[in-house]
Amino acid sequence: MKRIIFNFCFVWLAVSAFAGSKVVEMRNYGLVPDTHENLSPKLQKALQDIKSQVALGDKVTLLFESGRYDFHPEGAAVREYYISNHDQDNPKTVGFPLEDWKGLTVDGQGADFIFHGRMLPLSLLRSENCTLRNFSIDFETPHIAQVKILESGEEGITFEPAAWVKCRINEKGFFEAYGEGWSSAPQGGIAFEEKTKRLVYRTSDLWCPMEGVKEVSPRVYHAPQWKDARLKPGTVVALRTYYRPAPGIFLSNDKDTRLQNVKVHYAEGMGLLAQLCENITLDEFSVCLRGDKDPRYFTTQADATHFSSCRGKIDSRNGLYEGMMDDAINVHGTYLKIKQRLDDHTVIARYMHPQAYGFEWGVNGDEVQFVRSATMELTGGKNRVKEILPNDKDTVKGAKEYRITFAEPLDAEITDKEGFGIENLSWCPEVYFADNVIRNNRARGTLFSTPLKTVVERNLFDHTSGTAILLCGDCNGWFETGACRNVLIRNNRFINALTNMFQFTEAVISIYPEIPDLEHQKKYFHGGKGEKGVVIEDNYFETFDRPVLFAKSIDGLIFKNNVIRQNTDYPAFHHNKSRFRLLHTRNVKIEKNNFEDGDESIARE
């Protein structure tokens, strides 16, 4: 009887706090900072209790106190999630499983959420008008192993792991990092300059063979097969695999979501992955280090932010993105490939990339169009989905194939004898990306593939290593839609992009759709609305190399009123020796720019 009375009083105290003010003080559920205990069980109980006492639609704030909170896999939630552009291994262990909320705010008030093992820190699904603010996400033991080069020569490389890295030599003789419930034997890496934390010039993705590694003194290892003259003593290498099981924050099927003053310091996948969401605002959302004195050199295993098949508006501003292993932002949809044409209205279509399937592709009434994969040309007119059903599963969850019936007859050219993709036009967002800093990261700065208005302004792109801005589109490898029709890039500053080579890194700004048969392409992929399809104006470029703009298959491009300043910070090396390289383009204007060295060279092909 006493226990029943105690539990009743505990719940009454917690609920009464929010019943009047709609604020739940998480301390009342035992979620107290700086205890270093595993708070996963208490968090799950708190979320269940609060949800059971809140009417759907009530505005509720979960209020944490500032300080450190630890969450381990034991006692955490377990979910089956199919997350775009991540490894589709299930189940996922989830710290904050926030599902089916309206008007929810999670306010950390400076809380530092620390996760252990292999977890998805926070998910928000099927929710409306929700806000996440004032907290950070990190892991006690990242799955990337940071090491410092001590010696590098013909006999191999000697290195020292960072103090927090748990490591050993495994039974196969490989260097292995490990943590709570996981282990990893990385043989790839990214090299950083010790003092600047920039990627080392012309190193790109390193091969770091670890066969026969020996521990030559306590926590000092020698890898005889790892030989690389570019890696001088003092160089810091982030040893990594390409495994990406979960992002730091996962948003799916949400509407009107806001993230404010949220920092992701590490995640084994992307910092933020949003799919099938409508209207997302990021204000001071960052994927970043813990300041200048942070001993780490890396943040996330993949992109900082990634938006797959979203709609409405993506508004991202005032963020800091650094040290991540891919783009600061990537916006795209997903092509399905037609595998069978059953009749004039019906096809079997399939997700093609192994990291993109299992989530909803479309619903009845969605507008679609068709693209020929080889030339990336639109074929036939627009159509609408009359019915869409999973073909290889009983439910959408986990499905790779769909049986799709269209409202109008299919064009006779659209067959399963050659490659055709289907693009869902109803799930494309408008994008505003402004006042952000992107620096010291792998691969690219930003990537946009949406036909709706995209504005990129007042950002600083500082040593992004590859292309700073990429406009892509690919129905052959990544299967990421689509064409860019209305892009404005203005008042940005670019500092020494292209210190390394990665995919699509043809210039500081690269308009690079993946077109296997460009020779036979008659139409154009990007643009299409006259010369104002993509406008690049009033930007400032500082570069040590030649290529500023690469453009392929675009109708409508303006490059004007930009300043290009040549420096000697690094030796020029890029294979593209022209300021501008244009392949299969039309309606291009390059005018009123200031080239301090006078080089305005244009290569047209």
Swiss-Prot record:
Q: Which residues form the signal peptide?
A: 1-19
Q: What class of enzyme is it?
A: hydrolase
Q: Which Gene3D superfamilies match?
A: Single-stranded right-handed beta-helix, Pectin lyase-like (2.160.20.10)
| Keywords, comma-separated and alphabetical | Glycosidase, Hydrolase, Repeat, Signal
Instruction: Note the Pfam families from the entry.
Output: Beta-barrel_GLAA-B_I, Beta-barrel_GLAA-B_II
The family note in this entry says: Belongs to the glycosyl hydrolase 110 family. B subfamily.
Described by its record, this protein's role is as follows:
Alpha-galactosidase. Removes both branched alpha-1,3-linked galactose residues of blood group B antigens and linear alpha-1,3-linked galactose structures.
Protein name as catalogued: Alpha-1,3-galactosidase B
Q: What is the originating organism of this protein?
A: Phocaeicola vulgatus (strain ATCC 8482 / DSM 1447 / JCM 5826 / CCUG 4940 / NBRC 14291 / NCTC 11154) (Bacteroides vulgatus)
